[in-house]
Regions:
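Nuclease and nuclease-like effector domains acting on nucleic acids or nucleotide cofactors
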Residues: 3, 16, 20-24
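Bacterial N-terminal signal peptides that target proteins for export
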Residues: 1-9
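Bacterial N-terminal signal peptides
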Residues: 9-17
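Charged, low-complexity intrinsically disordered terminal segments
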Residues: 21-136, 140-422
């Protein structure tokens, strides 16, 4: 009996040691994937993932895909501008509609007032619908304006349920050629093919039904077309997990925030993050600081010249706080870096519309995805290293030397008190 007891005891100890060893060897992508599945988020296999960092290449491929569409083109952007690029996009959509494709287009109404395709007026909207485009604007902006603080900041496209686009580019001339006030435009978008497009298609359809004036009916994805994608999944298959922030489903209010926090908490070696705005919510800040405090190497570039002065004040002040916890911060020069990306430990990356500010993390409708693919993450890391060559190193001495006390004081106010509103 005593011998049996000792054997059981040794077996239990051995199992405990094996479990501890397995846990210690878990990589960031494994930890993050487990969290996302526990939250009910779906992992989709992708056939191919292509990265874009300039608007010309992205639009060239997008318009070619629209021209080759056979059944449907669903397109959702914050901005489709009333300029040469926006009109060219409408022209390609019109041709797709003439070929018999189902063409749906959705843009945010508030931004249309400022830079949109004449969509504020009924005449402007009717002129687009007359082209065969089923067009809606998200949440018409009207009195009382305080009821319309939640805007559609997403940038997603679904073509024939087999090609999808997601990222940070809108459809406007300055997303290709830049703006005189802050130089060129640098951004990140990805093109995904295969079964992984289902997630984007579902997000679009849900939004279209929730706030649009059309798009009624249940959406059905033809999974049988991608049976081979699902059958042949292995450890080398790129996998995509989408997450969003939106009020169509109350459970989605914190989904983006919690997913990003989980990514920070999963990191063991490196976090590389790009965002034009560095005014995250308190919980996201704490996750970043936790990663730094446990020795994770964190690199954060942001634009030296921003598109809004008030946000720039806050960016610099929060960057100073990150420095004090050991982060490596860089200032991107020469153009406006609008990317919203993150790479964790070289194993998983994030691309989408989510900025690191309260507006994106609490208020706006957003869409992004984690890409579980070392090849894609390595390519984003390579681009990140190239971008660092266009950066100045940010330090406390640099901050005090280059920016007057008045600027630094404004940054303190924005970072401390106005962060929840930006």
């Amino acid at each position: 009996m005593r011998t049996l007891t000792l054997r059981i005891l040794f077996a239990c100890i051995a199992c405990a040691l094996l479990c501890a060893s397995a846990s210690a060897q878990e990589t960031a992508d494994t930890i993050l994937m487990r969290y996302l599945r526990q939250e009910g988020l779906i992992s989709y296999p992708a056939r191919d993932i292509r990265i874009y960092t300039n608007g010309h290449d992205k639009l060239e491929d997008l318009f070619r895909d629209i021209d080759n569409a056979k059944k449907k083109v669903w397109i959702e952007y914050l901005i489709i501008a009333n300029d040469s690029v926006g009109k060219l996009c409408i022209s390609h959509l019109e041709q797709a509609a003439r070929r018999g494709c189902e063409v749906r287009m959705m843009t945010d109404d508030y931004k249309d007032w400022e830079r949109g395709y004449g969509m504020r007026t009924k005449e402007g909207m009717d002129s687009i619908r007359s082209l065969g485009i089923d067009f809606v604007t998200f949440d018409r902006f009207k009195f009382p304006w305080y009821n319309h603080v939640y805007r559609d900041h997403r940038k997603i496209v679904n073509i024939d349920d087999s090609i999808g686009y997601i990222g940070g580019f809108n459809i406007a001339d300055y997303y290709v050629n830049g703006n005189p006030s802050y130089g060129g435009w640098h951004d990140t978008h990805i093109r995904i093919t295969g079964a992984a497009v289902e997630g984007m298609a579902r997000y679009f359809h849900q939004q279209y039904q929730y706030r649009g004036t059309g798009g009624k009916g249940k959406y059905t994805f033809a999974r049988y077309l991608f049976d081979e994608d699902y059958r042949n999944v292995n450890e080398h298959t790129p996998k995509v997990v989408y997450f969003e922030l939106g009020r169509a489903n109350k459970q989605k209010k914190a989904e983006a925030r919690n997913a990003i926090i989980a990514a920070f908490d999963a990191a063991q070696d490196t976090i590389r993050m790009v965002s034009p705005y560095l005014l995250p919510t308190h919980t996201v800040r704490q996750a970043m600081i936790r990663a730094l405090d446990r020795g994770v190497h964190v690199e954060v570039p942001f634009p030296k010249k921003g598109d809004m002065d008030m946000l720039s004040y806050g960016n610099f002040h929060f960057a100073k706080r990150l420095l004090r916890h050991g982060a490596h911060v860089f200032l991107y020069k020469g153009s406006f870096h609008h990317s919203k990306i993150m790479m964790i430990d070289g194993t998983v990356s994030m691309v989408g519309s989510v900025n690191m500010n309260s507006r994106s993390l609490k208020w706006d409708y957003e869409a992004a995805c984690f890409v579980f693919d070392r090849k894609t993450t390595a390519e984003l890391d390579r681009i990140f290293e190239e971008d660092k060559l266009q950066c100045d190193t940010f330090s406390l001495e640099y901050y005090k030397r280059e920016f007057p006390r008045k600027f630094r004081h404004k940054g303190w106010w924005v970072d401390r008190f106005l962060t929840p509103f930006f």
